[in-house]
Amino acid sequence: MADSSGRVGKSGGSGTGKGAVSAEQVIAGFNRLRQEQRGLASKAAELEMELNEHSLVIDTLKEVDETRKCYRMVGGVLVERTVKEVLPALEGNKEQIQKIIETLSQQLQAKGKELNEFREKHNIRLMGEDEKPAAKENSEGAGAKSSSAGVLVS
């Protein structure tokens, strides 16, 4: 017996209801992976901009006298220092940012690989994707493809 959501109850074939939940779980998992990948890419882009800012400031400070006063934001407080004191700290920060960017890049590649494996495992196609390769696969192995239904994600 079907309820208002269109799922089949216990008296009917419960396999169809389980399949719908499974497809929803696959889509949710895929969207979660995509969101994680976007978050990594966003953080990497943000750090790239920060790295460029550090490079500009370092290049500018290298051209001025080491005893010249400069101001640095430390924990929300503007602190007066000399170029001689600030320059090594900025260079250290720049190196740390570069290491973090490299780590994020590796994580981004791993997440992309994980996402592609998930897509292949669950036969996920994105809307607007070229369907010619899928048609070619269907003509070669029609028997194998009919048993696993693909998931279309918008």
From Swiss-Prot:
SUPFAM superfamilies assigned: Prefoldin
Keywords assigned: Chaperone, Cytoplasm, Mitochondrion, Nucleus
Compositionally biased tracts (Basic and acidic residues): 126-139
GO cellular component, one term: mitochondrion
GO biological process: negative regulation of amyloid fibril formation; positive regulation of cytoskeleton organization; protein folding
Extent of Low complexity compositional bias: 141-154
Biased composition (Gly residues): 9-18
Any one GO molecular function term: unfolded protein binding
Function: Binds specifically to cytosolic chaperonin (c-CPN) and transfers target proteins to it. Binds to nascent polypeptide chain and promotes folding in an environment in which there are many competing pathways for nonnative proteins.
Name listed for the protein in its UniProt record: Prefoldin subunit 2
Name of the encoding gene: Pfdn2
